[in-house]
Amino acid sequence: MKLPDLSEFELSEFISICRDHLALSGYTTQQVPLLTPALEEEILAAGKPFISPNFSTRLSDFTHENGFWVTLRHEGRLVGTVAARVDRIGHEAFGDYLERVFSKQYPMEDGPSVKAALPGVLAGVHGDIVYMGDMYFHPEHRGNIAKTICFVRAAFGAVFMKWQSVGMLFAFQRYADDLAGKVAQYGFCSGQYQGVIE
């Protein structure tokens, strides 16, 4: 599952198309290298109830090289976010990685493990993987499918522009969103990129 051979120019053109479409409705996007206390405060003030452990600067270490946020603003006000982080797991199997990381961040006393819930083909994936999460849209800015698609696809473009070695991009989505078809709208499972789980 490798990213097709796209040049940085082609990726930047793709991102520009998405950003231009958003601008037609008064939205701007920005790639922010690190979650600062000011940005975290702004995200929480926009209505997001919490920052997940995987993207919390209190629980995880970040550099300009291993993570970033993409923000969505309308008339200067933050109304949406998504975050991305790369983990270079090398030869460690994806299932083992998830088990190790998520058992610390989301401890459960019973129930199936994260690894046990993975299809066998994914459990053995290794290399450079990107986790995207903390996607949030203010309630007043939900429901516009074209806006959502453009924002998330611009974030995908930013991921692949920054980390062209990525072998897989994954996210956890709510079951209700999956049933409503939103996961495909976001671009996951859509076949948009070979690096996205299909």
Tell me the role of every PLM-derived stretch.
Residues 1, 75-77, 139:
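Polar low-complexity intrinsically disordered regions
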Residues 23-128, 133-135:
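A conserved beta-strand-loop-helix scaffold within acyl/acetyltransferase catalytic domains
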Residues 1-38:
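Sequence termini and other peripheral, non-core segments
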Residues 24-34, 169, 188-189, 193-194:
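Generic preference for hydrophobic/aromatic residues in regular secondary structure cores
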